[in-house]
Swiss-Prot record:
Main location: cytoplasm
Gene name tied to this protein: lsrR
Organism this protein belongs to: Photorhabdus laumondii subsp. laumondii (strain DSM 15139 / CIP 105565 / TT01) (Photorhabdus luminescens subsp. laumondii)
Family listed: Belongs to the SorC transcriptional regulatory family.
Description of how activity is regulated: Inactivated by phosphorylated autoinducer-2 (phospho-AI-2). Phospho-AI-2 acts by binding to LsrR, which is then unable to bind to the promoter regions, allowing the transcription of the target genes.
DNA-binding region: 21-44
Keywords per UniProt: Cytoplasm, DNA-binding, Repressor, Transcription, Transcription regulation
Lineage of producing organism: Bacteria, Pseudomonadati, Pseudomonadota, Gammaproteobacteria, Enterobacterales
Coiled-coil spans in chain: none
Protein name: Transcriptional regulator LsrR
Pfam family, one: Crp
GO terms for biological process, alphabetical: regulation of DNA-templated transcription
Amino acid sequence: MSEEELLARIAWFYYHDGLTQGDIGDLLGLSRLKVSRLLEKGRQSGVIRVQINSRYEGCLALEDTLQKHFSLKQVRVLPALANMNLSARLGVGAAHLLMALIEPQQLLAVGFGETTMCALQHLSGFISSQQIRLVTLSGGVGPYMTGIGQLDAACSINIIPAPLRASTAQVAETFRQESSVRDVLLAACAADIAIVGIGAVNQQQQATIMRSGYISGGEQLMFGRKGAVGDILGYFMRADGELVEDMQIHQELIGISMPELKTIPTVIGVAGGEEKAEAIIAALNGQYINGLVTEEQTARVMLNLLR
């Protein structure tokens, strides 16, 4: 590991994860004095500013490998750190990436999920100052409120006024034909950048779509038996990235479709945890996302699965 990469890891742990210099020294096998000197060197050299100004903000070798394998436009792999809130850390990483990509007054489309909502929380001031417009990618107001509820009241936000999932395909189609719903769906398709979470079938009760009550435990087991490994916006994918066929839920969803998601120029998937590795690969295989924010251990598991 080069000194610059070591410095960037130390800076991330210190400024974003709140570890003490002693904790970082124990984690990396360095003395507290060495950690302190590297932080000071980083500040003097300009590597450390308000943000971590370094190409080693993530884990460069893993980023390069994933970028080349999947032809990604953007990829960030955060350094592994045990016993920290992974969704919050990924949210910070995603927020930093979006701040570097999105231009003033552009339209950002957002999918539901704990990690994407963490990113929105960290983007709150940036969204206001840059006059970024927001639109949701799916129905279901509840799953979005932990992120949208933190934004300035003056922010431009278009929310699909419908549930994520209707009781039948016919009811879902009726919702989609309502002008108030249709107009937001059209706006979502015209977004400049999108950020989405990736769910894993093996998450069990932890998945947002389950915790929000949109699918049952029995349905999740059935989806797994049909070959599903994960989902984006409630659309379930096989390991090869193809959508699982004959899934009633796909006709009952209210939101943009996967082909429509692919028309958005930049779609960033944000997900981490070893249990999500296969689902992330499926999303990449299906080319539903062309950017990724994840963490080091997840990336290593992904690469092992690809061998």
